[in-house]
């Protein structure tokens, strides 16, 4: 129904009533057939797993609230509480935080590992600590260097023995070859000498030749003796 206001005996509709009437009488625009279809609904993204914020091992041991930008959180995870326990016993939490704040982030990991190692060495050897471990390692290095030098000397000696043995074998082979060559030369010389003897007469033939000459001399003497009286 329209609400009417009476002004001087004349009923006039109110503004709210007129607005309602215009809304009901306004035709609804139907989508034109040439309009583009609505975009397909985007696939629903899987729900993100809830992030469980767990305090780091340092804050858990110290029983304090772990802040978002905790200096100790990246280096002492909650899964390894013994790491912070060892360092905390020797250096203390305040000193560890102070050391880390004085260093750039690129060197903090090495610093934490060094503090944990030194704290463990101090707990194992309260007197010398890390220096004792370094001393033992240096002594091992010296012993290994001495063994290496000894092995190198032995290796040089074995190489010299090998070279001398090879030289001895070479000399023996050369001597053997020279002996064989001399034997072959001797055999060839003897064979050539024997072949040359075929052209030399034997002693019997020489004696026969000499006998023939003696016979000739005797005949000549006999003939001369026959002619001797004729000339006397």
Swiss-Prot record:
Composition-biased stretches (Low complexity): 188-202
Positions of region (Disordered): 1-50, 181-218
InterPro entries in UniProt: LOB
PROSITE patterns named in the record: LOB
Record's compositionally biased regions (Pro residues): 34-50
Tissue: Expressed in young shoots, stems, leaves and flowers.
LOB domain residues: 54-155
Pfam family, one: LOB
Family: Belongs to the LOB domain-containing protein family.
Matches recorded under PANTHER family: LOB DOMAIN-CONTAINING PROTEIN 11, LOB DOMAIN-CONTAINING PROTEIN 4-RELATED
Name of the protein in its database record: LOB domain-containing protein 11
Organism expressing this protein natively: Arabidopsis thaliana (Mouse-ear cress)
